[in-house]
Amino acid sequence: MKTFIIRFIHITAIFLGLVSLAFSQTPPAPGEPKRFPQITLEQLPPDARPLGEEIIKISSVGLGGPYNVMLRSPVFADRMKRLLDYLRFNTSLPTRLNEFAIIIQGKVWRSQVEWYAHYPLAIKAGLPQQVADDLKAGIRPRDMKPDEAVVYDVSMEMINNHQISDALFQKAKAILGEQQLVDLVAVSGTYVTVAMLLALGQEMPPAGKPLPFP
């Protein structure tokens, strides 16, 4: 009986996890205002405007997307931007793998903006189209290179098990090295935060652009 209960709980947990992944981040209901009206440079406190100007220079969505939410807390936004500057532009991970890690979280969270913004960057950086499309379809990507497979496996084990096995750790360290492995987990966790901020604000791709996850 005890074994049955444990198996039932395990199966239920898996089912609930799959159900949760079926929900996409959704826009406001028709006629409803945005949770966070789009902020402008002029609306920022004077001491936060230099930060806003920096964001506009590097962001594909200007002050939109996660920045529209983050800037409600300017000190946090400043710290987060500095972290993102490292994880986007100065990380030890090759861009192909870094963007792959980001869209894995975009898929798991079904984050419309995260996928919209980073899918083309992943392809541009050399991630095979089939790998990205298989990921979006919800299947283990086929024909991954060894380093891509490690990024996928580490990301998914962390998501599903909240840890990785000793065997995967040793494999990942052998392929990526210690610094890249740490940077991989850091970028993955940071983009969970980004996905949550986007969900909080119900931020969507620019008007007229199709939703990646209908």
Annotate each predicted stretch with a short phrase.
Residues 9-20:
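Bacterial N-terminal signal peptides
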Residues 23-214:
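Hydrophobic alpha-helical segments
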Residues 1-7:
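N-terminal secretory signal peptides that target proteins for export/translocation
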